[in-house]
Amino acid sequence: MPHGQPCGACDGSCRMAQRGTPSTSPLIPSLTPSPPAGDPSPRSSQRIDAVRVPARLPGGSDHPEYGMPLSPRALRPYLARGPGAFCAPPWRPDVNRLAGDVNRLFRGISTSSIHVTEDSRTLRRALLDFYAMGYTHTRPTLECWQSLLQLLPEQSFPLRATLRALNSEDRYEQRFLEPPSDPPNTLFGEECDVSGDESPSEEEEEDEASGESSVSEFSPEEETASSEYDSFSDVGEDDSSCTGKWSSSESESDSESDAPTNNHHPTTRASAAKKRRKRQPPKGERPTKSARR
């Protein structure tokens, strides 16, 4: 029986006035006696507080969020196939279903993404944005829904029907969801803070490249100084053990003072070298065979 008609449980006084019509109907009078003047009925005041403006306006007006009402015949083909077949009225939040769906998305990111941490943050941010829109009463338009979920107008039929059914409810009481009672066995979204899978962004790569190019290279003077430093560091090492000869004339002069004195063998290597210098012929003359030897 239509709402507002008299029946065993309704006396007709709770009927809702149509838009643009007077609050009382002269065709269907009230079946209950009117209360005395100055004695308002507490029952009627409570009923007025519970009245909520329906989301579907009278006459099936076009709603900015989910459009015109859809017939079951037009909706049925899109509930079983296509990208839009992810919801159907009636719809209620299910924390176990939500945990499983989010975990499947994390699995796809962890197995195929090259930026696991960055993409995981993106998914978490998207979930929070949709919650924040509902909490702040920010309702997307139909075109905004289609753009966010990347659906064609025909593919959004199930979504439109589901949104209309949700908004046609009288009221929702605030409640808090507990953690899922049946969580997934493997949580693909769990990762440590230092996972090593974050690749540097383009800005970081440019900074590193500029830092490498700005490193000063050794100049020829610095290389010469470093080579001289290396040669000085090796002076203290005696190379006579490996060559069997004195390394320079300075070492010969040093060895002359350090050479052991022997009365029977006064000739040293230093004196022999001096004798060889005296035997050298003047410039321009060829040395004799004995001098060559």
Swiss-Prot record:
Extent of Basic and acidic residues compositional bias: 282-293
Protein name (database record): Transcriptional regulator ICP22 homolog
Annotated GO CC locations: host cell nucleus
Family as reported in the entry's similarity comment: Belongs to the herpesviridae ICP22 family.
Gene Ontology biological process terms in this record: regulation of gene expression
Keywords carried by this UniProt record: Early protein
GO MF annotation: an example: identical protein binding
Residue ranges, compositional bias (Basic residues): 272-281
Compositional bias annotation for Low complexity: 21-31
InterPro entries: IE68 (IPR003403)
One Pfam family linked to the record: Herpes_IE68
Segments of this protein annotated with the region Disordered: 1-49, 175-293
Species of origin: Equine herpesvirus 1 (strain Kentucky A) (EHV-1)
Comp. bias intervals (Acidic residues): 190-210
